[in-house]
């Protein structure tokens, strides 16, 4: 009798497994067109994303190389030292700590104030490229009167910082499965979130103006205005 019960249970388990397999096959067959369409669309999307990411990475490398010399503290100090109008000596690079510097002491010499201002320009650009919060540096840059076109660039940088760096957003969204979360243990397909796509577009637009911003703030004309205003 026990042998019969054991055999009966084994047959039940086998029967249930067959039923589950048949139902799964029917569901997959019934939805084959949707599944195929999903994977085809996702494959195309992944190709486009991969190509776009590769292009963005190459552009970022070029941008970093382009700014590398300009963004070094040593080059900054050499530049300020080379300006003939500056009569006050500038300390060597070891004397300046590579961090945000708020210049509030009126006793500090004007050329040092300008150096600190440029140091914050460096840090802002570096943090922007690295997608790090640059609120403090931006506030320091905006504290000085600037032409409207330069302020527009800084305003765009502020929007970018507030929208994407201060408050972090999810970089991807799940497109399959949507309604059956338990399936994520077996398969999960994601794509770049709309927020990230807009973020990349915004960053590209700012990068186009970044050179103009840097060269203006490093220009001798701006330095003269900066010095004359604080004298």
From Swiss-Prot:
Keywords, alphabetical: Membrane, Transmembrane, Transmembrane helix
Transmembrane segments: 10-30
Subcellular location: Membrane
GO cellular component terms attached to this protein's record: membrane
Membrane topology: Single-pass membrane protein
Descriptive protein name: Uncharacterized protein RP473
High-level lineage: Bacteria, Pseudomonadati, Pseudomonadota, Alphaproteobacteria, Rickettsiales
């Amino acid at each position: 009798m026990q042998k019969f019960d054991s055999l009966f249970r084994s047959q039940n388990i086998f029967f249930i497994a067959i039923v589950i397999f048949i139902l799964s096959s029917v569901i997959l067959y019934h939805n084959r067109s949707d599944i195929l369409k999903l994977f085809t669309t996702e494959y195309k999307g992944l190709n486009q994303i991969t190509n776009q990411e590769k292009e963005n990475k190459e552009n970022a490398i070029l941008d970093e190389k382009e700014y590398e010399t300009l963004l070094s503290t040593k080059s900054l100090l050499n530049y300020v030292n080379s300006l003939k109008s500056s009569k006050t000596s500038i300390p060597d690079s070891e004397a300046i700590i590579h961090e945000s510097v708020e210049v509030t002491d009126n006793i500090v010499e004007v050329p040092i104030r300008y150096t600190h201002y440029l140091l914050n320009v460096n840090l802002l650009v570096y943090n922007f490229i690295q997608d790090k919060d640059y609120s403090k540096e931006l506030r320091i840059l905006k504290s000085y009167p600037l032409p409207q076109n330069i302020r527009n660039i800084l305003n765009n940088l502020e929007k970018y910082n507030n929208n994407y760096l201060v408050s972090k957003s999810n970089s991807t969204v799940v497109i399959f499965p949507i309604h059956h979360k338990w399936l994520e243990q077996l398969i999960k397909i994601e794509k770049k979130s709309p927020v990230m796509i807009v973020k990349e577009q915004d960053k590209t637009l700012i990068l186009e103006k970044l050179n103009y911003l840097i060269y203006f703030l490093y220009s001798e004309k701006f330095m003269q205005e900066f010095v004359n205003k604080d004298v």
